[in-house]
A protein has these predicted regions:
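Residue-level detector of high-confidence beta-strand sites
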Residues: 30-32, 81, 150
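A short acidic/small-residue loop/turn micro-motif
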Residues: 34-37, 86, 154-157
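ATP-binding/phosphotransfer module of carbohydrate and carboxylate kinases, centering on a glycine-rich
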Residues: 1-62, 71-75, 93-103, 116-125, ...
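Glycine-rich phosphate-binding loop of actin/hexokinase-like ATP-binding domains
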Residues: 125-187
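A cytosolic small-molecule/anion-sensing beta-strand core signal
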Residues: 67, 74, 143-144
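Short loop/edge segments at beta-strand edges and connector loops
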Residues: 105-109
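A charged helix-plus-loop insertion that forms the helical arch/lid used to bind
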Residues: 76-87
C-alpha cells in the first residue's frame, strides 16, 4: 500500500512499541504500551497504536511488524516465537483483519538489520550482517538495503547453530540453551546471549551478578570479568569468522544490550583473522546507530520499496 507515512511495530514479550515515520525516515511519534501476555491482548495493543498513529497522520498508514519468531510464507502460521502465545497462530491474517489493511511481518532481528542498513550504521555499506545480543542471540542479512530471508526464512539466524572450535571447557558446559525451542548442545545462544553470559559467569564464580554488573566489574579492573569478557570476545570472533566465510559482509553491526560494551569494537576485529581463511579481514564491526529504536524503525522500513 502507498502512504506518505510508515508505522513500525516492535512486538516484545511484555511491551509493544510503535513508531510513526515520514517518507524521509523522520520520527514523528513513538509510543510503547504494556499488554497482557496473551494473543488477543497483543492484537488489541497493536491496533491501539495503529489507530493513534493514523489519527496523528490523518492517513491510513502502512504497517510493518517485527516479531520474535517467524511467519510461514505458505501458511502464515507463526513458529519459534519466544512469545509462546504467538506460536501456531495465523498472526498476520488476524492482524490484517483487525487493522483492515495489508501488514508486513518479519523477524525482529531482520528488522534491526534493515534499520541499520537503510539509514543507520550500515547505510554506506552494500552487504550487512546484523546481530542482536540481548535476551537471545539473533541475526539477519541485508544486501542493497533489502533483507535476505532465504528459502526457509532463516538466513542469518545463527543463534541456534553450534559454537565453532569449542574448547574443552565449552564442551563440558552444563548450562542449557535458554530458548524454549532449542535444547541443542553447544548452541551459540547459551554462550552469547546476555542471559547465557551472566549465567556462565555466576555458575563459574558462585555469584549472582547481572550482565550489566559484570561489565561494570570489568571497568573496575576485576580480573574475573576481564577474563570472561575476553573469552566471550573470542567466541564472537569464531562465530563471525564463520559468517564472513559464508556471506563475507562489508560490515557486521551489533545491537541489543551487550552491544554497548565498548571494548568489543577494538578487541573482536583483531581476533577474527585467527579463524578466517584469509590473512586480512576488511569487514567492519560496528555499533548500531539507532539504539533501542532500531528494531521498530526497521519494521516501518519493511515498506521502503513502496
Amino acid at each position: 500500500m502507498k502512504s506518505k507515512f510508515k508505522i513500525g511495530i516492535d512486538y516484545g514479550g511484555t511491551k509493544i512499541e510503535g513508531i510513526l515515520l515520514d517518507q524521509d525516515g523522520k520520527q514523528l511519534e513513538r509510543k510503547r504500551y504494556s499488554y497482557e501476555r496473551n494473543y488477543l491482548s497483543g492484537i488489541e495493543t497493536v491496533k491501539k497504536l495503529v489507530d493513534e498513529f493514523d489519527k496523528i497522520s490523518e492517513e491510513v498508514c502502512s504497517v510493518g511488524v517485527g516479531i520474535p519468531g517467524f511467519s510461514s510464507r505458505q501458511t502464515g502460521i507463526i513458529t519459534n516465537a519466544n512469545s509462546l502465545w504467538l506460536n501456531d497462530k495465523p498472526f498476520k491474517k488476524d492482524l490484517e483483519l483487525a487493522l483492515n489493511r495489508e501488514v508486513r511481518l518479519m523477524n525482529d532481528a531482520n528488522c534491526f538489520t534493515l534499520s541499520e542498513a537503510v539509514d543507520g550504521a550500515g547505510k554506506d555499506y552494500k552487504s550487512i550482517f546484523g546481530i542482536i545480543i540481548g535476551t537471545g542471540f539473533g541475526g539477519g542479512l541485508s544486501y542493497n538495503k533489502s533483507i535476505i530471508e532465504g528459502s526457509n526464512q532463516i538466513a542469518g539466524d545463527w543463534g541456534h547453530q553450534p559454537l565453532p572450535y569449542p574448547t574443552k571447557e565449552e564442551q563440558e558446559t552444563k548450562i542449557s540453551c535458554p530458548s524454549n525451542n532449542c535444547g541443542r548442545p553447544l548452541c551459540a545462544e547459551q554462550f552469547m546471549s546476555g542471559i547465557g553470559f551472566k549465567d556462565r559467569f555466576n555458575q563459574k564464580y558462585d555469584t549472582n551478578f547481572t550482565s550489566e554488573e559484570i561489565v561494570k566489574l570489568d571497568l573496575e579492573k576485576d580480573p574475573r570479568a576481564n577474563l570472561e569478557l575476553g573469552l566471550y570476545e573470542d567466541r564472537m570472533a569464531r562465530l563471525m569468522a564463520v559468517m564472513i566465510g559464508i556471506f563475507d559482509p562489508d560490515a557486521i553491526i551489533l545491537g541489543g544490550g551487550m552491544s554497548n560494551i565498548d571494548r568489543f569494537y577494538k578487541n573482536i576485529p583483531s581476533l577474527i583473522p585467527k579463524y578466517t581463511f584469509s590473512n586480512k579481514v576488511e569487514t567492519k564491526v560496528l555499533k548500531n546507530l539507532h539504539g533501542d529504536s532500531s528494531g521498530v524503525r526497521g519494521a516501518a522500513w519493511l515498506w521502503n520499496n513502496v
